[in-house]
Amino acid sequence: MNTRGSGSSSSSSSSQASLMAFSEPPKPASQPSPPSSPMSERPPSGRSRRRAQEPGRFLGVRRRPWGRYAAEIRDPTTKERHWLGTFDTAQEAALAYDRAALSMKGAQARTNFVYTHAAYNYPPFLAPFHAPQYAAAAAAPSSVQYGGGVGAAPHIGSYGHHHHHHHHHGHGAASGASSVGECSTMPVMVPVDPHRSSMSSSLLDMDRNGHDFLFSGADDNSGYLSSVVPESCLRPRGGGAAADHQDMRRYSDADAYGMMGLREDVDDLAQMVAGFWGGGDAADQLGACGFPASGGAADMVASSQGSDSYSPFSFLSH
């Protein structure tokens, strides 16, 4: 009895399993998975791969909290950041960055926009400050007409209009019809006036003559007045011997007039001394000292010539 029960149970279970197998849908054949490469398993590093540029953002442009956009660029050689300015829109800041990048790296620069080959002819970024030879090279082919003519100075484009906006406002009147974003590196040429040039040459000659007049050579440093002041200033031109004789006569008349005034002063001094001592004793004392008691300058000169005693006014007689 037990064998029949066990056989019936096993047959029923097998029949149920077969029914379940027919009821299940057939499984598709599995395809072999491709072998995984070792590069895909490694996570990408931030230094090796550059971060993808987000839409709406530009290289070298940052947005300020108050709504303006700042542009700056980093020098690849010195690793220094150069400030390009703040702008109202992100496109203007991106243009300023592109011009600075083209000035630094040329065709190898990464820019925000696509440019033609003509845009690569910008001067170096720091040319106006560190390389004056670029300005001299630009001035060589320029043609300038002097004497009232007007010369056309070449213009070299800068890397940004807003980077030196105060320079553009300052040179606006001089440049005239210069385009936006360009600045002139040529100096302003002033036409030469022939009359002013002759005046300047005459002033230069006067300056040189004055220098020769004040600072003479080493061989003329004798110490006399003639080595400092020319003889033409000391002696008037023309006249010859007659002029010299007239000058000597003028000097002798002046000396005689001075001696007369000095003798009158001596007479006044004698009278003052006589009044101070008083009486006849004064005359004796004046006679002993060599002063005449009366008679004026003539008696004093006569007494001084006739007496052997010392007189302090004896030099007046010579």
Curated annotation (Swiss-Prot):
The keyword Nucleus applies. The keyword Transcription applies. Residues 25-37 have a biased composition (Pro residues). It comes from the Eukaryota. One of its GO terms (cellular component) is nucleus. Disruption phenotype: Altered specification of terminal and lateral spikelet meristems, resulting in the generation of a panicle composed of excessive ramification of rachis-branches. SUPFAM superfamilies: DNA-binding domain. InterPro entries: AP2/ERF_dom, AP2/ERF_dom_sf, DNA-bd_dom_sf. Residues 1-59, 158-178 are annotated as: Disordered. It is found in: Nucleus. Residues 1-15 have a biased composition (Low complexity). Residues 57-114 bind DNA. PROSITE patterns: AP2_ERF. Changing residue 86 to M: In fzp-3; absence of floret formation and replacement by excessive ramification of rachis-branches. Required to prevent the formation of axillary meristems within the spikelet meristem and permit the subsequent establishment of floral meristem identity. Mediates the transition from spikelet to floret meristem. Determines the transition from panicle branching to spikelet formation. May specify floral organ identity by regulating the class B genes (Agamous-like genes) MADS6 and MADS17, as well as class E genes MADS1, MADS7 and MADS8 in floral meristem. Possesses transactivation activity. Belongs to the AP2/ERF transcription factor family. ERF subfamily. This is Ethylene-responsive transcription factor FZP. The lineage of its organism: Eukaryota, Viridiplantae, Streptophyta, Embryophyta, Tracheophyta.
